[in-house]
Amino acid sequence: MFPQNRPPTHLQASVATGAASGPPQSLKLTYPETLDRIKEEFQFLQSQYHSLKLECEKLATEKTEIQRHYVMYYEMSYGLNIEMHKQTEIAKRLNVICAQLVPFLSQEHQQQVVQAVERAKQVTMAELNAAIGVRFIPPQLTVHQLQAQHLSHHAPPIPLTPHPSSLQHPGLAAATSASSLLGYLVFLAFRHNLLQKRAADAEHRERDPGPSCLTLPNGERVPTLSDYLNSNTKRKTEEKDFGTDYGSDADRSEDNLVVDEDPASPHSVHSYSSRENGVDKPTLQRKDPPPASPNSMTSSSSVSPSRSKDIPSQQVEKAGTPGLKSSTPNSQSDLNTPGPSGTSASQFRSIATKPAIDSLALGLRTPLGGQGGYPAAFSIAHPSVNADGAGAYAGLHLMSPQINGATAAGTYGRSPLVSYDPHAHMRGLGSAIPGSASGKPAYSFHVSADGQMQPVPFPPDALIGSGIPRHARQLHVLNHGEVVCAVTISNSTRHVYTGGKGCVKVWDVGQPGTKTPVAQLDCLNRDNYIRSCKLLPDGRSLIVGGEASTLSIWDLASPTPRIKAELTSSAPACYALAISPDAKVCFSCCSDGNIVVWDLQNQTLVRQFQGHTDGASCIDISHDGTKLWTGGLDNTVRCWDLREGRQLQQHDFNSQIFSLGYCPTGEWLAVGMESSNIEVLHVSKPDKYQLHLHESCVLSLQFASCGKWFVSTGKDNLLNAWRTPYGASIFQSKESSSVLSCDVSTDDQFIVTGSGDKKATVYEVIY
């Protein structure tokens, strides 16, 4: 345990004496001395750590203060920018008015007025400086006086509004501009003082490093954190206060398809009495409209293809043909809320998002959501929805699953408008006039040409008669495994096709029992969502489109389904497809707003309809194949003449269009919107109906072949069946997540839906 050559005890003293008297030797530290030295160094490091911590806290406080001033300045800058554009627009309009009035003056006065107008336009810098000096910057004011004035001008602070329409009264604009400039001066003064203080601190540290500076053995000084921050003038901003962090696939989406998952919600189907459209409450009480998404903003997000990789929308000149503008209110919010709503994404096209998005906002824009659903459901902002979890169309501001589904588009919730009596035995009872005795608010309104809204008195046969369903029964649940953004059912009603992420699965629903896919058609990229799939009438070919520039045509007649052709366009995504009645032509709605016409026999691009200024989200074709109806994230529905290749009509709305359907018997067009409303328009008259049962974006819509009823689905997890055209509610089904897509069989016997909880549901329609 001890060295064997240690000298005997009686010799140690003499050895020590000899050592003391001998030549000096190197200092040898004992263990206690070493421990004391380590303790001192530890205490020094601890002190250094403490000083660095205090400095870090100080810097954090300064950062918070600077950010607060930055936000304040941003609000002021935004207000000034809006005011500048507003005044510019006013000047343009006044100039036009002057130009129109001059010809009415006498010849001698015309020249004088023209010269006076020209003189008024010649504003010199001296005049500008004089005006600014008088109105905004009294030279004698000190910084403290400016601060006091700034505080008085900004109590409360300027609201950062999403739309110019919500600015203050013009009379307040000047005060707002003046106070904004004063606030900016205060910000500059504060920044100058702060920089001076930091420079002084840095100089002091250079002279006396003190305990907050580490010194290396070679005499070099280790820079402190504040030294680094002061010298690194090009550092990136650490945080973006208004940005959205899409940290996972489940939260991300191009256009923010927005999907709400609530597995606890049971499936339920309710039938309602036709007499439940009360007339005692003609105006609906709704929650405040959702905040504008960057798209509408886009969902937009985000089923707005919400909201969030935003694909810059291709700004195309609107078709030159005169459009039929809808002059009647488009929604209840038109009557009660000022200005357009905004996605996301785009809503944050979002988004503030993407919109978000979308929101597929959508989120088509929002986002393929919301903020958003489709990509960003339709806010589509754009071609790929990456969420592993539930997303849904609101990225139109479909919100794709990453859509925020949206942002997109975000959630556009509103309070329930109607409470239904589920007893079907009430169907045959009741007069044609909805009785106010029920005390239930109306959900269906007729809008006349002059914009007057009145609750619809349903006829006695609204829910009875040939071809009108009584309810629907859930028949099969098809566990696809990914968010189901597209569904279709074959004419034979034996096979159902469900489109999810990167593939279409084929299901045989002709037999009872647990269902497994009989085939899987891999198309697009593995991480891109299928947005639409359409069967040709003969059932031998399937066309698939989605978050890619290529459409795939599958040969289903071969022993093993295979791709027999691919159609490639310049747009990064396809949101919807339609097939002509003769199956010779395919129409695809693109994320750049164009409608591409494909010759299926020669597999070539025939023409493009240009008019939508944002993604085209939905499409339907008339029964005779002569007219095409399209809806877009630019808040318009357009009708195209397929024989002449031109636009016939245009209807403008205050909300992004996520879905539409044209009645097979003609005359009526149903439009589902991000605002949660459905509008049923007469194609040749100004009359229309507004339906208010959905509580969030209407993501899909499909007419029955008989034309007497149609179904709609939404982000509120609902499947609603409606009577054409006045919208009496036939039945309603509640699913466990956002219902992104639907289809009705050609014999009107089955309904298929695709939802955000990664499954499709087959319903049997009971008559």
Curated annotation (Swiss-Prot):
Entry's Gene Ontology cellular component terms: nucleus; transcription regulator complex
GO MF assignments: transcription corepressor activity
Modification note: Ubiquitinated by XIAP/BIRC4.
Bias (Low complexity): 294-306
Biased composition (Polar residues): 324-346
Entry-linked Pfam families: TLE_N (PF03920), WD40 (PF00400)
Entry's localization field: Nucleus
Region (CCN domain): 212-274
Protein's job: Nuclear effector molecule.
This protein's name: Transducin-like enhancer protein 1
Source organism (scientific name): Xenopus laevis
